[in-house]
Regions:
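NTP/phosphate- and nucleic-acid-binding module
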Residues: 34, 38-534
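Residue-level detector of transmembrane insertion/anchoring sites
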Residues: 9, 15-16, 22, 397, ...
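Short, positively charged and aromatic/hydrophobic N-terminal segments
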Residues: 3, 7, 14, 21-25, ...
């Protein structure tokens, strides 16, 4: 049962200060957002779409700062509440349906704590570092490239030499955002969390990306029967990065969810036609320069050399189609090719799937051709043979990856689907993604209606994510349930007591229809079903 509408509408207060959790003190970036041009939708009504999403998240319990009742809790850690957890689970189920099972992938679940040598082999101990600068007056530490990006509005490649980044800081007269003090020369900070394991104090690390689990587990998977290439391995789980200045809610975290796909393939063998024929006609929105966008089919992109590898074109098509299927407007998506100084240290070629938001273009998926970098590195450090055998020859598998940020994707879903219609706010998530699928409401709290509504709720709660909502006027309850995205409200009224029918209200249209209680499960199952895979 959800808290009352009154409780929801009051919002929540910071127990430490009595201030609203959405105050400027707690979230200094609020109110500093400029909407990019050329967009339609919710963000055109207000440049404060981020504020609206944060307000919704905190008031309704989608997500909120971890350990918020304690002073001094570290930034960059957020907890999902009941609605956020349900939305995350729905999103992951959609990923499993439209990416994992659609392509016949093999899903694993690896440990988040890994041996030091894993990251010696992967290069993370040496190269996984951000450029930082310190204020010489107050001592505050900042990501140097982010400060420059905020000042200039241009992307600053992380791999630029530290001296060049510092020269840009001086040229642009960038000072400390906190106190206006002068900034120090740029140095590097490794973002991995180091651990001491057991009484012996064995050095280990929290994984900075889930894919390393897939690489070190590949040999076991290969030897236990999954030996046909391409071999797409995938994993959903948590990764950890000791970010310098995490902020903006779910967009920059120290602990975060990833859904990663690592496709191991024979570089001398073409992609099978079964896969290719399914997606070669998918329209890709490619941006080679970060400005213009070319719309071209996956097949044309490969034949014209815009995307060098057929397997690369196929998986770019797969991931773009996934976001379109879950309701992201194609016109708000682009696949941006990264320049040489933007690519990760392990990548031969990189694309970012980005979605347009009130904060500008936001990266959701890193799509990298990693070559044999990873498996060759692990062979060298571990001493184990990770070669595969295919058509009479041995080879080191190459890798193409789709590294998805789940938390960021959830933020985008909220922003793109939060709509104001007059005085009504509606979270128009696709019904199959809604955290609460159906609400059961007695028209009034008397005359046997609550008892009958409870019977209906008990009938539905096992098969659907259902809630029972009573107390306020029916209009107030509808408004509250619209805001959290409930697609269907089942109202038990006086006619129900006469003929065993209920009113089903559609969230998006507000239209109502009578449905028999005996046929209600089948009606909801059809209305809430995941779209058919094509």
């Amino acid at each position: 049962v959800l808290p009352s509408s009154d409780t929801f509408l009051k919002g929540s207060l910071d127990s430490r200060s009595g201030q609203g959790l959405l105050s400027r003190e707690n979230f200094p970036e609020i109110g500093q957002i400029t909407a990019p041009t050329g967009r339609t939708g919710w963000w055109d009504l207000s440049s404060r779409a981020y504020d609206e999403v944060m307000d919704l998240a905190l008031r309704r319990g989608f997500y909120f700062p971890s350990c918020e009742i304690y002073d001094g809790a570290p930034a960059g850690f957020w907890d999902y509440g009941p609605l956020g957890t349900a939305l995350k689970n729905r999103f992951v189920e959609a990923w499993r349906r439209y990416v994992v099972r659609y392509d016949g992938m093999v899903e694993l679940d690896g440990s988040v704590i890994m041996a030091k040598d894993v990251f010696v082999a992967s290069g993370h101990l040496e190269s996984f570092a951000d450029p930082i600068t310190r204020c010489t007056r107050c001592g505050a530490v900042f990501r140097a490239d982010r400060l420059l990006q905020e000042r200039t509005g241009r992307i600053v490649p992380e791999r630029l030499p530290d001296s060049e980044i510092y020269a840009m800081i001086l040229k642009e007269s960038v000072t400390c955002p906190s106190c206006g003090g002068q900034l120090s020369e740029v140095t590097r900070f490794n973002m991995m969390f180091r651990l001491s394991v057991g009484g012996e104090g064995t050095e280990a690390y929290l994984r900075p990306e889930t894919c390393q689990s897939l690489f070190v587990d590949y040999l076991r998977v290969y030897k236990t029967g999954w030996s046909k290439f391409p071999l797409p391995l995938c994993q959903f789980g948590k990764s950890f990065r000791n970010e310098i200045s995490p902020r903006q809610g779910l967009l920059r975290l120290r602990e975060f969810y990833q859904a990663e796909v690592e496709v191991l393939f024979d570089p001398e063998e073409d992609l099978d036609e079964r896969r290719w024929n399914k997606l070669k006609g998918q329209v890709l929105r490619l941006s080679q320069d970060g400005e213009s966008i070319t719309e071209v089919s996956a097949e044309e992109a490969w034949r014209e050399g815009l995307v060098p590898l057929k397997i690369e074109a196929y998986y770019l098509a797969l991931i773009q189609k996934f976001y379109e299927t879950i309701g992201i407007d194609r016109s708000k998506i682009r696949l941006r090719r990264l320049g040489e100084d933007e690519k990760p240290f392990y990548a031969r070629e990189s694309w970012d799937l980005e979605v347009q938001t009130s904060l500008g273009w936001l990266e959701l998926v890193a799509c990298n051709y990693r070559g044999d970098y990873d498996l060759s590195g692990h062979m060298r450090v571990s001493g184990k043979d990770l070669t595969a055998f295919n058509r009479g020859r041995k080879f080191v598998p190459h890798v193409f990856e789709l590294s998805m940020g789940v938390d960021r994707s959830l933020y985008v879903l909220l922003e793109h689907n939060l709509v104001r219609e007059g005085r009504r706010k509606v979270l128009k998530l696709p019904p199959f993604l809604a955290p609460v699928q159906v609400a059961v409401l007695p028209l009034v709290d008397r005359d046997g209606l609550p008892e009958k509504a409870t019977e209906v709720y008990e009938m539905l709660r096992v098969d659907f994510d259902a809630v029972y909502e009573a107390g306020d006027t029916i209009g107030k309850r509808y408004h509250m349930l619209d805001e959290i995205g409930v697609p269907y409200c089942v109202t038990v009224d006086y006619q129900t007591l006469q003929d065993d029918t209920v009113t089903v209200r559609d969230r998006d249209t507000t239209r109502q229809e009578r449905v028999t209680i005996s046929g209600l499960k089948a009606w909801l199952a059809k209305a809430l079903a995941f779209p058919e895979v094509r």
